Amino acid sequence: MKIIKTADYNEMSKVAANIIAAQITLKPNSVLGLATGSSPIGTYKELISKYENGEIDFSDITTVNLDEYKGMPRTNEQSYYYFMNDNLFDHVNIDKNRTHVPNGMAEDAELECKEYEKLVKSVGGVDLQLLGLGRNGHIGFNEPSEEFAKETHCVDLTESTIEANKRFFASADDVPRQAFSMGIGTIMAAKKIVVVVSGADKAEAVKKAFTGPVTPNVPGSILQFHGDVTVVCDAEAYAELEK
């Protein structure tokens, strides 16, 4: 595991975007695993800039997203489908038919999980997976629990995750209580993983996940067992590692 300390959010975003741009350049038909939330927005802005400057080409890229709120229609601005279009897909030359996000409105949750897992395998698996890290150490919507969930599954969101996500909604009551998420096994099957983490409120999670014991109570800690992980932190998120 390689942990890179950067000065601030902007530098963190640039470093992460450079790693992804290199992947696209070296393998133009890469499968990218993508994340949502505030952490990767800057990375996506940098990728859009690189595309506009003619540095990278998304025309042969396939994407699979980590997660989606259960019961959230794709037209809702808080859906991760909407987020991805708004923050990346609408601004680059990607084929929308090759962008995949779990269907939050699927009537059969169990079937949707199985189908999404099949989809990830059918595109050849993930070449590079972009992740954020939750305050409670979650990756995707894999919350702290008794065991690591292996495959795509439907998960109950913890109070801390609902609290963290309520800033995107009118109130905490509007935050969905469940989500579809790639499992830890699905994430770990990616050939390369890049984690972006920023802010002082993530510093404790960084320390626990990347220097503490590997435990399902801190889902991100499993990344210590992956052979090719780069964690890109801003100075605030890195702070606990310097103590």
Language model features with spans:
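Conserved phosphate- and dinucleotide-binding cores of soluble alpha/beta proteins
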Residues: I4, M72-Q78, Y82-D86, D90-K243
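N-terminal active-site beta-alpha-beta segment that forms phosphate/nucleotide-binding
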Residues: K2-E115, L119-S122
